[in-house]
UniProtKB/Swiss-Prot annotation:
Belongs to the intron maturase 2 family. MatK subfamily. It comes from the Eukaryota. HAMAP family: MatK. GO terms for biological process: mRNA processing; RNA splicing; tRNA processing. Usually encoded in the trnK tRNA gene intron. Probably assists in splicing its own and other chloroplast group II introns. It comes from Rhamnus cathartica (Common buckthorn). The keyword Membrane does not apply. GO terms for molecular function: RNA binding. This is Maturase K. GO terms for cellular component: chloroplast. Keywords: Chloroplast, mRNA processing, Plastid, RNA-binding, tRNA processing.
Amino acid sequence: MEEFQRYFELDRSQQHDLLYPLIFREYIYAFAHDHGLNRSDLLENVGYDNKSSLRIVKRFITRMYRQNHLIISANDSTQNKCFGYNKNLYSQMISEGFAVIVEIPFSLRLPPSGTEIVKYYNLQSIHSIFPFLEDKFPRLNYVLDVLIPYPIHLEILVQILRYWVKDASSLHLLRLFLHEYSNWNSFITTKKSISIFSKTNPRLFLFLYNSYACEYESILLFLRNQFSHLRLTSSGVFFERIYFYGKIKHPVEEVFANDFPAIRRVFKDPFMHYVRYQGKSFLVSKDTPLLMNKWKYYLVHLWQWHFYVWAQPGRIYINLLFKHSFGFLGYLSSVRQNLSLVRSQTLENSFIMDNAIKKLDTLAPISPLIGSLAKMQFCSALGHPVSKSTWTDSSDFSIINRFARICRNLSHYYSGSSKKKNLYRIKYILRLSCVKTLACKHKSTVRVFLKRFGSELLEEFFTEEEDVLSFIFPRTYSTFRSLYRGRVWYLDIVCINDLVNQE
């Protein structure tokens, strides 16, 4: 057990205990302000106006020195409903600045000398997920579809941070922020309170949730690494999507001290694959349903007894890869077998063998996309294009530009689809809806409008992704053309639209 105890040993020299004084530093709010400016235009900004200058910040810090603006009465709910509204500008600025401060102990954890770990400053980094989606799963049969439960009480999030943030004042301030979004005395935190918190201060919510998920995954992935034939020499690179810069070493040796040998015999699986994004994770294995059920109930007991989180076994599904598809990252994924006949010739005999090659198909989910377009009044519930009557007051250029931007974003996001048929259908709905909107504006039919202006009017704006690649790389167009027929993953798809967050 000495090896495992060293693995979970805390790096005391890396801990930083004085975070609370940073609240009075002007550059902290400049970082938070710059983070807000760099967010996607499609993400709703419900915070304060990002165009405010640092003059407001200086005035705010001066008032913090003179008065105690951090104390907010719990009975003052009528004046300060939530930090996200403009009624309490200073509290909103504190919460966004605090979100930058609590990331410092994690961001300063540099890898040991002699190792090279790529740093990704975006905490929503999904770069490690693409190799999972490109895997052929040659020996894997079952998938464990896991919905990670939320903590029933927000105090659990504060307790998790105590291992890293030793400043008691900062922890009390965090409790004050969380108190604004839920009744702290209540035993259960409602889903509505979590939703308000995630929309008002997404950076702080993302950090707290990643810290919570990281704690349980530090146990789960440690078990996975010990049983795998492909042990990793640098876990910080592969599990970058879970940890910020390196593997967080939490002292959980007491969990394995007594029953680790038994756990190792039960969960021995050399080909376990694991991936997570936000609140959904997958464990893919080649073993029997019995082992997958053991993993299922182990996760349930781990959440309930180690993290005091109520987990329902019904939120964890065991599916056969060849018969069930699973939704992940806004895609509908399933494993398909390609059968091919191979003839083997010897000196005397010849044999015909069936060779099955597995491939993970990633498709654009047609039904949810049509439902989203119908909700936005681009088509009917059956997928028939209709005119967008609310846009008829805009100019022709503005109408075409709006439709084209949606079409380009969808093409960019779903460029990783192994089959483009569903994507072409969605683009057809958007183009015909655009034509019907223009025809409605000019009080004519679609046929008359196209005869008058010609179909070339839309070609300039609805540029195919393949044509864009040919403009960027004209000399290697033939290579990119063959590449585009396959799957192309863009690393910025989370920032383009929030389809992935609507799962």
